[in-house]
Amino acid sequence: MKSLRQVLRDYLVRRAFVGGYSWDVDKYSLILEVITYSLIPVPVITYLITKSLPLSLMLAPTPALPILLVVIWSTYSVDSVKEGVEWELPFFVVLLDIVHDVGGDITHAFELSGKVGLRWIGREWSIIRRYSLTTNSITKAMQVRARLHPSLEFQRFVNGYVSVWSYSGDVGGYVRSVEGTYLSTLSSRLSSLSRQIIDVVVATVSSLVVLILFVIVTTVLGMNYAILYIVPAVALLLPALIARVYQSIPYIIRMDVIRDKSVYMALGASVMVAAILILYLGVKGVMALMLPPLLFSAMVTRRVNAMRDSIMALPDLMRDISEIVKAGVGIGAAIERILDNPYPPPLIAYLRGINQLSGNAEVNGPWIMRFAMGVLRELSSLGSPSRALDRLVEVFLELKTIMMGINYGSRSLQLLNYSLPAVFAGITYISRFVVQTISSIIENAPYALIGLSIPGINAVLMPLLLTAYIVSLSVALLSSLLGNLSINPTIKYVIPIPLTLALMLITVEIPVLA
């Protein structure tokens, strides 16, 4: 019978082979065994100390927690390999088609994958080369890796390619036949993912607004108004949703821009100013909470818009270069000729960088931009195949269509973002109306209503303002994630935040119609 250490070791070995990892399984299994056995007496010791049987029973699964955490960690590691390879596989197929056009094969495409930003595919190539040291054959090593790989798409592609390579030899036709399928599948996955995210976000925010109304009604009808502070805590679920949405958006289409230290310094200073104003001014100082998002968005708006324009201009760039190359000009000379065209400044800067003599200028920007510049840089050494450039035009047109489709699909979320000021202003007005109406009834009643406490509007307003701020900021970030595919919101996405706070404070000052 196997010991716990042997069982854990065998499990980690299998997961390491599937994921292509080099884990120290002996060390991990030994540590897990020691921790698990040391936790077995915990329920018994707890019962001897507390004499509480329910508490001891609750702690009974404690010894299994380390094993559960390792299972979750190993599963997440393997799933990361699967998702990363499946997102990059369509672009690798495009790169392979380009390499075939100049007489290369899949090994050359694997070699180039790391240079053009396909890091997960490049990782697979390093694993295949390691396997080839024992199989003495690249094709056998590819089949071994495909057999162990967690992605069925990668398995089918590699096995199909090796089969065609071994028999008919028409690998170019095979690649062209699956290229369109992979690109259309990529488009469908991204579109369905964006729709699911939008539906979940809208449902969550709508449910939160209903919860706020329910808590307000129960509060003004006599419950302790401290329960209102539960609502901001519930609203903090939205930042967790933002983190999950950010992870759900594939890095291949995210527009992450580089932020310098001045942005973080300004953000920190604005947070300190807002905190000081709230301490001194109380409820009215909450208006200062608009400073951090407004200042941050003002500093990144130009950069985000320029980067988005650069990505949207990639199909036109590839088309212009393709037309010049077809006239018999090399890619380097073609890039020099189009530098005077009215392209966005970041795109011009990237083109100047890759056209230097060294050709090794680092591209700091979104993954799409790194892939485009990397392919252009490598094409100059592949002989400037015009057909490859035409294929790149189609690829970037497809990506542009996908990104525009996600943007249009998020319009409902953007409408929700701009409707939040009116929603929260209406909630504030209704709260004042109900509070003042019931207070007037109690004051004019001929008898005492014992046990009925009506909170003041200021007691209701502070948690409402905090909730409105959290919800509005979260929806602004979510709108930016699905509109610009960036966690950096531009001005148009954060405008509802100060509008929400201002309208709520104005609503408190205007008279209530009795």
Summary of predicted features, one role per range:
Residues 55-146, 265-361, 370-377, 384-406, ...:
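Juxtamembrane/interface alpha-helical elements of multi-pass membrane proteins
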Residues 250-255, 479-486:
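Membrane-interface junctions at transmembrane-helix termini in multi-pass inner-membrane proteins
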Residues 506-514:
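Juxtamembrane boundary at the C-terminal end of a transmembrane helix
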Residues 32-47, 55, 59-68, 186-245, ...:
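Bilayer-spanning, highly hydrophobic alpha-helical transmembrane segments
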Residues 1-50, 69-82, 183-186, 200, ...:
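Membrane-interfacial amphipathic helices
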